[in-house]
Structures are given as C-alpha cells and as structure tokens.
Amino acid sequence: MFNGLMDPEMIRLAQDQMSRMTPADFARIQQQMMSNPDLMNMATESMKNMRPEDLKQAAEQLKHTRPEDMAEISEKMAKASPEDIAAMRAHADAQFTYQINAAQMLKKQGNELHSRGNFSDAAEKYLRAKNNLKEIPSSKGGAILLACSLNLMSCYLKTNQHEECIKEGSEVLGYDARNVKALYRRGQAYRDLGLFEDAVSDLSKAHEVSPEDETIADVLRDVKERLAVEGPGKASRGVVIEDITEENNVTSGENKKPSKEANGHAQGVKTDVDGLQALRDNPEAIRTFQNFISKTDPDTLAALSGGKAGDMSPDMFKTASSMIGKMSPEEIQKMVQTASSFKGDNPFAPTAPSTENGFTPTPDMLKLASDMMGKMSPEERERMFNMASSLKANAPASTSYGNAEASEPRESLGASGSSSGNSFVAPRSGFEPSIPSAPPADLQEQMRNQMKDPAMRQMFTSMIKNMNPEMMASMSEQFGMKLSQEDAAKAQQAMASLSPDALEKMMRWADRAQTGMEKAKKAKKWLFGKGGLIFAILMLVLAMVLHRLGYIGN
C-alpha cells in the first residue's frame, strides 16, 4: 500500500476539505464511513501499487467537490450492499478498460506514423492517448502512459521542439528518476539548446544506469568534448526549464511553511476536538465507531497510520480493537468524554509539547481504565504478554525519550486497575498509581532496571516467598494496586508454591508484560487521541473510493 497516505500534504488536503464542512456534514460523513467497513476494504485494495500522483489526483478531485455533494454520495455508498458496491466497481473497471483500450489504439497509430517519419501527427496521437489515461490509476495505465511520453519525447526531438521535450522528460523523471530513455532524450534536448552542463548531467546518469549502451557513451563523450572546447555556452537553464512551475511552488511553499504549519497545527487541534465532540454527543456514532474498529482488519488500521505510528504493529492494533469491541456503549461514551476533555496536542504526535505539563489523570479516568482491564480475558492478556516479549524492552533511550516514557504512565488511559484472577502478577504488570503514595515514574523505572540484575531478582524472589499477606498487601499498595487481605493471602500462597526458577521466570515475564501493557495503552491512546486525524484520512479514503467508482473526477 502507498505509505504516502500519511504524507503531510495529503493530510493538509483532507483537512482543507474538512474545514469547508459544517459540523453536521462532518459528523454525518464520519458516521457513514464507519458504518460500512466494506468501503475501507475496497479503498485498501484500490490503493495498492499506487503512486503519489494518484492519491494527489483523488485529493484534488475531493477539493473541487462540494461538501454537501460529498455527504449525499457517501450516504448512498454507506447504504450500498456488497453486491451494489461490486456492481459499481465492475462498471468503473469497464470504463477504465474502455479508456485504456482507446489509449492503446492511439499509441499504435502514433507508432505507425512515427515509423513513417510523420512525427507531428504521431505526437498528436500520443497526446490524445495520454489524455485518455488522465483518470486511470497508474497500476492499470502506467505502462502505456510511460511509453507514450517517451515516444512523444522522440517526436519533439525530431521536430526541434526541445523545450517541450525537456518538459515531457521532466514529467517522466518525476516518477521514474532512473529511466534511461528519458534521461538520454532530455540530455539530447539540452545539448541541442547549447546547455552542455545540463546535457552532461543527464547523459552521465543515463550512462550510469546503462553502462553497456555504446550510443549513450558516444553522445556523452561528444557533449563533454564540446563543453571543453566551447565552454558552458548559454547560461544553464536546466533547472528552470525542467521544473519552472514546481521550483516556484517549492520556493513559495518554503517561504510560507511556518505559517502554513502553524495554521495546520491549530486546525488539527480544532479538528480533533470537533470530531470527538461530535462523537461524544451522538450515541449512534459511538455505536458505529465501535463496530468499525472491531470489524476492520488490524492490517488496515495499521496501514492507515503509515510511518507515524512508531513501533506499533498490527498485533497492537488487534489487541486495542478487541478491547474496544468488548466495551459497552456506556464505556465507549465515557472513554470519548474523557478523551474530549484533554487539553493540547496528542502527546504521541511528532510536534507534541513536553509531557511535563500534561494533565493529571482523574479518579474517573483511572476507574474507567481499571474496568476495561478487569474485563480482559486471560487469552487477551496472554496475547499481550507474547506481544511484549518481542519488543526491545532493554534498548537504550535518550534523555528526551526517557522523559516521555516516564510521564506516559500518568497520561495514558490504558491498563490500570485490578483483577483478582491474576492478583499475584498484578503488582508487576504496570498498573497505574491509584493512591498518592505511589512512587514516581522515574523511581519505578529505576526499580525495573535494578530487577534486571540476576542477584537482585534472586534476593527479591526469596523475599516474596517468605512474605506474609500483610506485607504483600502493603507492597502492592506501593505499586498502585490495593489488595484486600484475602487477595493478598491468595497471592502469597500462590507465590510460595512456586519453585525459585519458576518465580524468577514469572518476574521476567511480568517485566515484559509491563512493557506490553504500555505499548497496548499507546496503541489504544493513538486510536482515540488522533480522532480528527483518522477522520481526515477517512476523507481521503472516501475520495479514493468515489474517484475509483467514477462519482468524482469523471
């Protein structure tokens, strides 16, 4: 799948569209998107083997589509059955096939004209073929488009339209930077314009890609000789000719980058708040959100995050979506209400401020997290433990990363609370502090590091085996989990029956489990903390589906 889905420019285009919508339209579309996972699956398939140009094209079409039209179309799509979607898709594929066949016919006619030396008429055929492929995804029409562009460059060279040849070559090299024919023919155009330095640059690259081609080597040698004898000749215009519009856009974009980023940042925060507010105030939207998360393939959720999800794997998304799927509507609503009350940015976002000034979890938040973890089945916990065992728990961290990790347990909405079914593991499983006397995060980290020492673990296991229930309850309280005397007695009895090796092994697993809990919390927080971003991505996905089915752009 094309990872550019999370590209900042793509997100900006989606958020621009969202900014044009009323809150009612936005809530309506997000609910419709979440109510039909088949649309997501179709979009995922549509985006395979895509180039950035394809997604940008869909985003541009989205920009020119009125929000009210988008809402009406998405409503029809949400109500469509899988059979209806398949029929629409078949119709769109048939249209694509028709356009591709027409382009192939035009290309063949152009080739015949080119072979007879009628280069002007051949160029016209190639241009018409390219125009037919304008709305076709590159995975289907990319090969024909490339052939037409390269043949068009040949026609331009033969008719001395060197400027047009350079522009066409620059277009090809924009998505295929090592295309030998494009480099060679653009180099020839530079040479004929007297731009010898630019010609040498392109021809040298072509020679690097295809060193055995004697024709390229001969032309390169000739241009180098002319450069040595005649000098650079005209002032090099290679960059200006090649990317005149693009370079101007880049320059303008660089000058405006800070203000754009600031505006986008503010819009992103507002979008998150608006999205969560709409979700919080709409029980039906909460239900469809839960259905969407629980039914959507974890690979799809992971793919939507692109490279911005850090080290969260599909397994982490699977764990989070499983937990969300088993929550009651009331719990989902409480979760959203809690998330919508957060101030500031998502602390996991790349531009997030320091977490030192973050919020302090309230008792309600901790109770909510506790209830969630208490309802996890043993199989889910085991899966979380297995997932944690593969993480780099012992990797060294920088100071800033350490600070973020230290503050994360106070900010996370995740695994906190108790469950009598696993009470003897709970004190080491990363539960959140629920009383003021809990040790700070840096002290907990220091204790975990000390427990990596085998001698320290042996001493600690011996101490635990001989600990009475009162001491067990007191120690669990220090770890943020208050056990009753009965639970403490059960935990002490269970530990006393373990062999030293088994107890030490259990402690190692508990340490890994703590890391697993934190990763799972991070995945879950990502799902809820980036609500506006997710819906922005969904807007792009919807645009891709509608573009594929011919609703927009055709």
Swiss-Prot record:
In which tissues is this gene expressed?
Ubiquitous. Highest expression in leaves and lowest in roots.
GO annotation terms (biological process): cytosol to endoplasmic reticulum transport; protein transport
Q: What is its main location?
A: endoplasmic reticulum
InterPro entries, alphabetically? OEP61 (IPR053319), TPR-like_helical_dom_sf (IPR011990), TPR_rpt (IPR019734)
Chain ranges passing through the membrane: 526-546
- SMART domains attached here? TPR
Q: What is this protein called?
A: Outer envelope protein 61
Keywords, in A-Z order: Chloroplast, Endoplasmic reticulum, Membrane, Plastid, Plastid outer membrane, Protein transport, Repeat, TPR repeat, Transmembrane, Transmembrane helix, Transport
Q: Tell me, what does this protein do in biology?
A: Plays a role in protein import into the endoplasmic reticulum (ER). May function as chaperone docking protein during post-translational protein translocation into the ER. Chaperone receptor mediating Hsp70-dependent protein targeting to chloroplasts. Interacts specifically with some chloroplast precursors, but not with mitochondrial precursors. Able to select precursors for delivery to the chloroplast translocase independently of Hsp70.
Q: Identify the stretch(es) annotated as Disordered.
A: 245-269, 395-439
Give the record's subunit note: Interacts (via TPR region) with HSP70-1, but not with HSP90-2. Interacts with ERDJ2A and ERDJ2B. In the ER membrane, associates with ERDJ2 in membrane complexes of 140 and 200 kDa and specifically interacts with the HSP70 and HSP90 chaperones via its TPR domain.
Swiss-Prot/TrEMBL domain comment:
The TPR region (103-213) is necessary for interaction with HSP70-1 while the linker domain (214-530) facilitates selective recognition of chloroplast precursor complexes.
Topology in the lipid bilayer is annotated as:
Single-pass membrane protein
Q: Where is the composition biased (Basic and acidic residues)?
A: 254-263
* Ranges per topology, Lumenal: 547-554
Q: Which Gene3D superfamilies match?
A: Tetratricopeptide repeat domain (1.25.40.10)
What stretches of residues are TPR repeats? Answer: 103-136, 180-213
Q: Name one GO cellular component term.
A: chloroplast outer membrane
Provide the protein's localization: Endoplasmic reticulum membrane; Plastid, Chloroplast outer membrane
Topology, Cytoplasmic side: 1-525
Q: Which domain of life is it from?
A: Eukaryota
Residue spans of biased composition, Low complexity class: 412-423
